[in-house]
Design a protein with these regions (language model features):
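Class I (Rossmann-like) S-adenosyl-L-methionine-dependent methyltransferase catalytic domain
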Residues: 2-123, 141-148, 162-229
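A conserved beta-strand element that flanks and buttresses the S-adenosyl-L-methionine
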Residues: 133
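Short catalytic micro-motifs in class I SAM-dependent methyltransferases
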Residues: 136-140
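A short glycine-rich, Lys/Arg-flanked "PGG" loop and its adjoining helix->strand segment in the class I
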Residues: 147-159
Length: 229
């Protein structure tokens, strides 16, 4: 079946260093290493934070109508989308840079619109979605490129932006499996708000790690809303 997307026209953009990195063998290895069925996915979060991902999602979007149109940017194999389906959401889209992950997602997720593409150039009309979200994606975007991908997320959202990312009060680079320049943590909600004054922070929750090996680290979920003009 061929899916038709409500596209906007744009000129092709040059890939960033991070996009090329994740589109290659390293990204494929990440996909194989981190793909889990729903029960294992929830157990993974339970072991890190003492909360399942479904519980975390419900805290932020539990009241969102289940027919809401939702886009996940950087969906990988679609584990988050499966979680949203389990919550009753039915109008779901995912976009993923890495072709291998897209193939896996189309096998793993049923009834979801999955396409290959870049978060820097989302092929959707302005305000098309009720919610645009990321899950551990902004951490892999170079700090100087964050305004560009965030701008696309804001453009495509008619109301809400949600993120789940690593957190630090200031931008901090992290060595990632021996590689430099591919992982950062910061206050991503603050970066959104600094670049888009038309947003307001609805909710933010810091989740400290409960396992001994990661004590002192914490991740964040946040929900932003477009302020009516």
């Amino acid at each position: 079946m061929t899916l038709c997307y409500p596209a906007k026209y744009s000129l092709p953009l040059q890939h960033t260093q991070q996009e090329d990195f994740w589109a290659g063998d390293f990204g494929r290895e990440y996909t194989d290493r981190n793909s889990r069925p729903l029960d294992e996915w929830n157990a993974f979060y339970q072991g890190i934070y003492g909360h399942t991902k479904l519980e975390m999602n419900a805290e932020f979007i539990g009241d969102l109508p289940r027919e809401a149109r939702v886009l996940e940017v950087g969906c990988n194999t679609g584990m988050q989308l499966v979680g949203l389906q389990a919550m009753g959401f039915s109008n779901l889209y995912g976009i993923e840079l890495q072709g291998y992950a897209v193939e896996k997602a189309r096998e793993f997720v049923r009834g979801v619109n999955i396409l290959q593409g870049s978060g820097f150039d989302l092929p959707f009309k302005d305000n098309y979605f009720d919610l645009v979200c990321t899950n551990g994606v902004l951490i892999h975007i170079a700090p100087e490129d964050l305004p560009r991908i965030m701008g696309e997320m804001v453009r495509c959202s008619g109301r809400y932006i949600m993120g789940y990312e690593y957190y630090a009060p200031d931008t901090t680079a992290i060595n990632y499996r021996g590689n430099e320049g591919f992982l950062w943590k910061t206050d991503f909600a603050r970066v959104f708000l600094e670049n888009h004054p038309g947003l307001r922070l609805v909710k933010q929750h810091l989740y400290p790690y409960i396992n001994d090996a990661e004590q002192g680290n914490q991740d964040v979920m946040f929900l932003l809303e477009k302020v009516p003009a």
